[in-house]
């Protein structure tokens, strides 16, 4: 099968090559991948930012049909459409797995990082961890919900945002665009979109953002304070440390910063402001299987609609460069159906 494999030596890019899959082990299923999106986390993995993984197949925004199951598998059957997500498998018995916080499992396995991922014609998955995709949901759109969508859905849950409150989505790309839709259409919030790209801001407006702020037009935090009196929550998807500092200063008292992006570096936090204004800072990491099932259902109901563009597998390094250059609106998705 054809797959996108991290280069050796690691250099931030991949090579499309033929790979032979191993046999299925107990509790596993084989998925014929239909589509797989390219996520910014794939860039981190390909560059070795989390530790070098040469030879690993990238991809954790995969959707496909089950073509084979190992003996004893009861959670899936041949023909089921399933997702291949970043949260690939947990231990199943730690305090996090047992209390609905499985993404924090210390023995977690991640698709496209510590296990071969979905940027390939086929992928082996742990059957009990492959969340089914509703038949009413476009599989191309489902790829974005598998990672970007559920990440933002969970982040807004963590933010505790309520109907009528203001939330800023900092970074209006693939993650941010879906976050805007979830905030507006599912949580009933008012949305401030922050980005430095006018095309992305226009897309944000079309998807429900009421206030648009171009970060090149001056201090983001001051603009937000002037326009809406500060936000109740800020969800940061922008991959630069300064965005986090600005987001904290854009909060109103008792506000909450939810960190989603993973830039290199540290975040500056004024202790006095944090205490006196009751500021809360929280990290949010993708979502659980239940979060993803809920996310898919909102997609099937038409409450969120990812911006997607299908590409060929041979274009994967061009896709990586475009994402590095901040030129992607929505998500680029590799089409394996017509490969």
Sequence positions of predicted segments:
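C-terminal hydrophobic helical "lid"/dimerization subdomain
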Residues: 3, 245, 289-339
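Glycine-rich beta-strand-centered segment in the early N-terminal region that forms part
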Residues: 22-36, 47-95, 129, 134-140
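Cysteine-cluster motifs in flexible loop/terminal segments that predominantly coordinate metals
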Residues: 39, 75-76, 86-131
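Mid-domain Rossmann-like dinucleotide-binding core that forms the NAD(H)/NADP(H) cofactor-binding site
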Residues: 82, 128, 135-223
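Glycine-rich cofactor phosphate-binding loops and adjacent beta1-alpha1 units
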Residues: 159-163, 201-280, 337-339
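Residues in the short beta-alpha loop(s) of Rossmann-like NAD(P)-binding domains
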Residues: 197, 263, 287
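Rossmann-fold dehydrogenase core element
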Residues: 256-258, 268-309
């Amino acid at each position: 099968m054809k797959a996108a494999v991290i280069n050796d030596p690691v250099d931030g890019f991949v090579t499309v090559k033929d790979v032979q899959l191993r046999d299925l082990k107990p509790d596993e299923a084989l998925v014929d991948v239909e589509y797989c999106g390219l996520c910014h986390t794939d860039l981190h993995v390909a560059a070795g930012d989390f530790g070098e993984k040469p030879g690993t197949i990238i991809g954790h925004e995969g959707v496909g049909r089950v073509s084979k199951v190992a003996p004893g598998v009861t959670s899936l059957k041949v023909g089921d459409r399933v997702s291949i997500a970043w949260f690939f498998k947990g231990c199943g018995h730690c305090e996090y797995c047992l209390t609905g916080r499985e993404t924090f499992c210390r023995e977690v396995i991640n698709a496209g990082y510590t296990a071969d991922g979905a940027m390939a014609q086929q992928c082996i998955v742990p059957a009990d961890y492959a969340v089914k995709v509703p038949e009413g949901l476009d599989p191309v759109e489902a790829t974005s919900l598998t990672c970007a969508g559920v990440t933002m859905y969970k982040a807004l849950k963590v933010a505790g945002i309520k109907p009528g409150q203001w939330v800023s989505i900092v970074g209006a790309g693939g993650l941010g665009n879906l976050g805007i839709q979830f905030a507006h259409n599912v949580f009933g919030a008012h949305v401030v979109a922050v980005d430095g790209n006018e095309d992305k801001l226009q897309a944000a407006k079309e998807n429900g953002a009421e206030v648009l702020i171009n970060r090149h037009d001056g201090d983001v935090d001051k603009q937000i304070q002037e326009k809406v009196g500060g936000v109740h929550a800020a969800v940061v998807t922008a991959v630069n440390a300064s965005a986090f500092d600005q987001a904290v200063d854009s909060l109103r008292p008792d506000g909450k910063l939810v960190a989603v992006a993973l830039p290199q570096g540290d975040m500056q936090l004024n202790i006095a402001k944090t205490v006196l204004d009751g500021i809360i800072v929280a990290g949010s990491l993708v979502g659980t299987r239940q979060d993803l099932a809920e996310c898919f259902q909102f997609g099937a109901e038409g409450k969120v609609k990812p911006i997607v563009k299908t590409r060929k597998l041979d274009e994967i390094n061009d896709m990586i460069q475009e994402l590095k250059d901040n030129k992607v609106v929505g998500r680029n998705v590799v089409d394996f159906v017509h490969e």
